[in-house]
Amino acid sequence: MMSQGGTVYLVGAGPGAADLMTLKGRALIEQADCVVYDALVSPVMLSWAKPGCEQVYVGKRAGNHALPQEQINKLLVECGRKYACTVRLKGGDPYVFGRGAEEAAALYAAGVAFEVVPGISSAIAGPAHAGIPVTHRSHCTQFTVFTGHEDATKTESTLDIAGIAAAKGTKVMLMGMSRLRSTLEQLMAAGQGGEVPAAAIQWAATARRRRVIATVATLADAVEQAGLGAPAVVVIGDVVACAPELDWYSRLPLAGKRIVVTRTREQAGELSSALSMLGADVTELPTIRIVPPTDRKDFAAAVVDSPHYDWLIFSSPNGVRKFFEAFFAVYEDIRELGGARIAAVGAGTAAELKKYGLMVDVMPKKAVAEELIAEFDRKADEFGGVANVTMLWVHSEKGRDVVYKELMKRQAIVDECIAYNTVPETEDPTGAKARLQEEGADLITFTSSSTVKNFMAMGIELPQGCKIASIGPITTATLKEYGLTPDIVSENHTIPGLVEAITAGFAS
């Protein structure tokens, strides 16, 4: 009988890439009160957790255990009794060499409710990411998966080397890099053909992937020469010969490029996802955080009065989101805005407005305030100018005042609606800063002046050879204030435009 309390979910994190997590797995992380995670879990997955969620690292790598398994079992029992929802996030699938069954048994014995959420195993996804199918009608119709790292407390091995050597089809070894040479020698001694194609894939199914292709007899030497290590998947079989034709990942335009995204934690997803889809290894290092404005009363009053204005002017997508969060706390219907016309600085802001069913009347081609003013001037005959017209300008606390000053010069009646403020991000739960400093990067992206200023305030030295990408002229100007000239500048000052510019930049 299960005791009263919460539920512990044993969730498979998949083979490495965050976008290969199951929908149920992500939903559980988003609602979790506590996440207990392993070493090979993508940091992006941890960023899905809600504010206040306790995150406990219990990673285990060969020879380096943050916490012994018995203590992990005890911890899960404690969390299950303390929290309504605990996610035990495990690389790959919880029940494929993941000791998930041991954890489930410990929870059952303690009377703690648990569920298992399967994940995509690296035994299948790792080879697939490297162009190697584990089955193929022309080569094999079965495959064998075995571990190269058995329980050290066993008095004798339960691994059937002779059976594996004699087995037909593809053979996949997980967690075997530290014993690769001896395992391959044992297999050949038991009858495994040394001339059979073999491959080792490090960081399989991630943008950091490295691959070595050889034969069973030569793979250990090839791995040493290439400097490959754990974590890795080893594949033995004729299907390895498919890799040159079926290696789709290496043909992606940003394959293997390490790119840093400095947007807010909430906004990073759009850019990160687009870059990842093109093959990039993305590190999210938020440098800013969106917080309420200093004067919340003024903001609330401006939102309440917004239906009385002739024009609403939005300077950023953040301004749109924060404005309408407050608007719908007061009004139930978007039509309460009345007949106000809408102006937006940039296509990104216009796209955010469209989510609320609002189309813009004025939008410059370039997402800068000066261009918005010029657009108002160009359309003066169409709208009758801005003199004596009431306008509510929705912007950030640290935004430039170009819009306000220029419209006032044209005798518009402009009120400000400060919808949010940006502050430096002080938390780094995923260790992104350390990863950047230790592993470097090919490119760092900046999407606003605030991201530049706060990144520089972190005191991080730019990695040697690292390029810089800027979303537009204002961000570029801020970079130059710090003596930095971006290598890539987006002509279309939107996230899709920045992605396009980055892709073109690396192609050249």
Model-found features: residue ranges?
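Conserved anion/nucleotide-ligand pocket segment
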Residues: 153-199
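Conserved beta-alpha
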Residues: 42, 52, 116-127, 142-154, ...
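Short, charged beta->alpha transition segments
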Residues: 43, 72-79, 129-133, 157-161, ...
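Short, well-ordered beta-strand core segments
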Residues: 33-35, 55, 86, 133, ...
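Residue-level preference for the first positions of well-ordered beta-strands
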Residues: 6-10, 34, 83-87, 142, ...
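Class I S-adenosyl-L-methionine
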Residues: 1-18, 23-120, 124-125, 220, ...
